[in-house]
Amino acid sequence: MTGTANPFGKILLYIDGSESSITAALFAIALSKAHGSMLRVIYVVNDNLLTELLGAKVFVQMEKMDYERDLEEDGKRKLNYIVKLAEKKGVKVQTILRKGIVHEEVSREVVSSDCDLLIQGELGEVLSLRDSFYEEGERILRKVSCPVLIVRNKQKVDRLYESV
């Protein structure tokens, strides 16, 4: 942009591997390309959930460790997929893989990277008030200290991604 600072200089994209987070990734890539923004992508292995499952005796310790390793590998694959999508459009991406409580890790990254915008996929369907307190996308939305863009409409985003 001529004569003005880029309002989206640092974009953080949160992905969880859902179809809506892939749609959000396509949008984040297109926006980053259009504005020359730095794009960082974060995936968080929810080890809090794993600990709860261990405590509820759904897992034994060895199963928890195996499942956690599987989730880390899955996170790496998803991050690498986003990198490939970005490379197709000439956008450089920095990936971040964390373990912890999802909304806290995303919020921590927003602060540490001083991001201008957080992008995430469409929120999951909330069937009860209780669900709204536990849906990670909702918790992220409430916790972070920067503007948040929720991406919807896969067909429109696909066209936008293809056009850049």
What does each model-identified segment do?
Residues Q120-K143, V157-Y161:
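Glycine-rich, Arg-bearing micro-motifs that act as flexible, cationic patches
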Residues A24, T51-L54, S107-R108, R130-D131, ...:
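Short, well-ordered secondary-structure micro-motifs
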Residues V44-D74, R159-V164:
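Acidic, proline/glycine-rich short linear motifs
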Residues A56-V60, S112-D114, E136-G137:
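Short, hinge-like loop/turn segments at secondary-structure boundaries
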Residues M1-N6, K84-L118, Q155-L160, V164:
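Structural beta-alpha unit
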Residues I42, Q94-R98, L149:
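General small-molecule cofactor/ligand-binding pocket signal
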Residues C146-D158:
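Short, flexible loop segments at boundaries between secondary-structure elements
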Residues G3-Q61, K143:
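Small/aliphatic-rich secondary-structure junction motif
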